[in-house]
Swiss-Prot record:
GO BP terms in the entry: animal organ development; growth hormone receptor signaling pathway; positive regulation of growth; positive regulation of receptor signaling pathway via JAK-STAT; response to nutrient levels
Glycosylation site positions: N137, N144
Protein name as catalogued: Somatolactin
Subcellular location: Secreted
Cysteine disulfide partners in this protein: C28-C38, C88-C204, C221-C229
Highest taxon of the lineage: Eukaryota
Gene3D superfamilies: 1.20.1250.10
One Gene Ontology term, aspect cellular component: extracellular space
Alphabetized GO MF terms: growth hormone activity; growth hormone receptor binding
Signal peptide coordinates: 1-23
Principal location listed in the UniProt entry: secreted
Keyword terms: Disulfide bond, Glycoprotein, Hormone, Secreted, Signal
UniProt record similarity statement: Belongs to the somatotropin/prolactin family.
Length: 230
């Protein structure tokens, strides 16, 4: 590892708490704890906040995955992540994957796809925090990053729900995906199996977090320059 890489790692460690503290909050709660303040934000500004949240979530998930990989996953095992038994938990979700599929769906369904992804990851990230506590050498920064992503994912869910409500012009919206069956680990695995499962979770979440960011930015593009979007 060269000196430049070391310096970049040190600066990332020092600046990370300030980066998170400076991020624009998505939470629209008023003093009573309700979300009545969210509708008062324009759809354009709310979408901007949601995009910024998604960008940060993806960035931190990428850092978390790299940290976990370097600390716990030997290189030969990194190649096993895509083998049978380590499929992503969101593989069965009705999420558009190809460019042609994405181009054909409406703005509302594009946003709903983001919501499906967000909601399907809330429980797995809570589970991940629990399992990471079992690791003897898990760094405090890795634990903090995972906790931060888990908390911010809930805020992102709230923002996306309000956005869908605004786009549908509805006063109330309940959009909850039943993730039962998507994520169920009833038996405590051995340590190697636990490492591979956690590595798969982090890798798959990083991939889906990037997909959330792309979908939201595409939605923004459609609303500002519809005919020149990818």
């Amino acid at each position: 590892m060269n000196m430049m890489t070391v310096k970049q790692g040190v600066w990332a460690a020092l600046l990370w708490p300030y980066l998170l503290a400076a991020s624009i909050p998505l939470d629209c709660k008023d003093e009573q704890g309700s979300f009545s303040a969210c509708p008062s934000i324009s759809q354009e500004k709310l979408l901007d906040r949601v995009i910024q949240h998604a960008e940060l979530i993806y960035r931190v998930s990428e850092e978390s995955c790299s940290m976990f990989e370097e600390m716990f996953v030997p290189f030969p095992l990194r190649l096993q992540r895509n083998q049978a038994g380590y499929a992503c938990i969101t593989k069965a979700l009705p999420i558009p994957s190809s460019k042609s599929e994405i181009q054909q769906i409406s703005d509302t369904w594009l946003l709903h796809s983001v919501l499906l992804l967000v909601q399907s990851w809330i429980d797995p990230l809570v589970y991940l925090q629990t399992t990471l506590d079992r690791y003897d050498n898990a760094s405090e920064m890795l634990l903090n990053k995972t906790k931060w992503v888990s908390d911010k994912l809930i805020s992102l869910e709230q923002g996306v729900v309000v956005l869908i409500r605004k786009m549908l012009d509805e006063g109330m919206l309940t959009a909850t995906y039943n993730e039962q069956g998507l994520f169920q680990y009833d038996v405590l695995p051995d340590m190697l199996e636990s490492v591979m499962r956690d590595y798969t979770l982090l890798s798959c979440f990083k991939k889906d977090a990037h997909k959330m960011e792309i979908f939201l930015k595409l939605l923004k593009c459609r609303q500002t320059d519809k005919y020149n979007c990818p």
